């Protein structure tokens, strides 16, 4: 009877969790409180990197310190987004129709993928930008983020805020030193170029004489490729489900900072970001690749670090 009970404990993760987590059992030899030789069963449960584990009664818990907190509502959705088991870009948008999409952007997209002579609806459906729910067709959030005429109407957090600070640190109160504060709200396929043009316009240009040739050459305050790659990565991989948040570009006298909303996705950490590749928004990243902004080989981050 004892062995049967022990086996029930050992098999509990397999019998009571969906999907089954990776785990192993371990027995420790001890002397119990009665002075008798005994054993303790330990179950070592590995952290799930890319899945949300549910109990057999469809509940989800997150281990926080020495407590297990049940995840509900928005907290559960955010956990699913973080694990990559749910994707905001693939969810339907019940408020958008084909008439809300920018025809120029759609035309440019069709040209990029060699589908100029194919019906737009057919292209969007084939590429996963149209999904059916109970027999009704809806655009996905990715379609709105990429192609919307008026992105602000859909409250999609598709914004980049540029701040220029006079100095090396931001000050407040009487010493407030923000000299430029510009928000750019556009669909992704317009946002990238709009932000690039604005930042280029804000950069100081220095002139110096080359040693040897004697020619005068101009160089911008910051070289373009690292900061532009940073913006591309932020746009492609940010957490668009993070309500009310936006990408922020802060230009100081001695540096340029790019902040992207949300936590690191899935297996990416601050320590491995330079060599670990994971796309939170695979559909958006694919389209940006087709527009030759993203190469999906983690090259952008490598350029920034080099």
Descriptions of predicted regions:
Residues 20-22, 157, 244-246:
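Short secondary-structure junction motifs
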Residues 64-243, 251-254, 262-278, 291, ...:
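Active-site helix-to-loop segments that bind/position phosphate- or nucleotide-bearing substrates
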Residues 3-7, 37, 224, 228, ...:
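Amphipathic alpha-helical transducer elements in NTP-driven molecular machines
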Residues 37-39, 245, 254:
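Beta-strand-connecting loop/turn residues
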Residues 45, 256-261:
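Conserved DxG motif in ATP/Mg2+-binding regions
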Residues 1-60:
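Divalent-cation
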């Amino acid at each position: 009877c004892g062995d049967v009970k022990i086996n029930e404990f050992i098999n509990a993760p397999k019998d009571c969790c969906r999907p089954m987590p990776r785990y192993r059992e371990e027995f420790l030899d001890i002397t119990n409180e009665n002075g008798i030789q005994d054993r303790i069963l330990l179950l070592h449960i590995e952290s799930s990197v890319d899945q949300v584990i549910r109990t057999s009664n469809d509940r989800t818990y997150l281990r926080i310190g020495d407590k297990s907190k049940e995840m509900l509502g928005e907290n559960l959705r955010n956990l699913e987004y973080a694990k990559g088991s749910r994707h905001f870009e693939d969810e339907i948008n019940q408020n958008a129709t084909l008439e809300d999409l920018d025809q120029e952007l759609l035309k440019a997209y069709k040209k990029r993928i060699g589908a100029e002579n194919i019906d737009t609806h057919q292209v969007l459906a084939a590429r996963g930008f149209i999904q059916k729910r109970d027999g009704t067709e809806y655009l996905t959030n990715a379609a709105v983020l990429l192609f919307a005429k008026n992105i602000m109407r859909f409250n999609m957090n598709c914004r980049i805020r540029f701040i220029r600070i006079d100095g090396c640190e931001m000050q407040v109160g009487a010493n407030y030193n923000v000299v430029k504060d510009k928000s750019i709200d556009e669909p992704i396929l317009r946002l990238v170029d709009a932000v690039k043009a604005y930042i280029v316009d804000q950069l100081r240009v220095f002139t110096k004489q080359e040693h040897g040739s004697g020619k005068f050459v101009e160089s911008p305050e910051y070289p373009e490729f690292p900061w532009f790659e940073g913006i591309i990565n932020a746009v492609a991989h940010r957490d668009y489900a993070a309500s009310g948040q936006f990408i922020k570009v802060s230009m100081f006298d001695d540096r340029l900072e790019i902040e992207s909303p949300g936590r690191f996705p899935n297996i990416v950490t601050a320590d491995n970001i330079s060599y670990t590749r994971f796309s939170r928004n695979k559909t958006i990243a694919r389209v940006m690749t087709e527009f030759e902004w993203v190469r999906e080989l983690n090259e952008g981050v490598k350029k920034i670090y080099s």
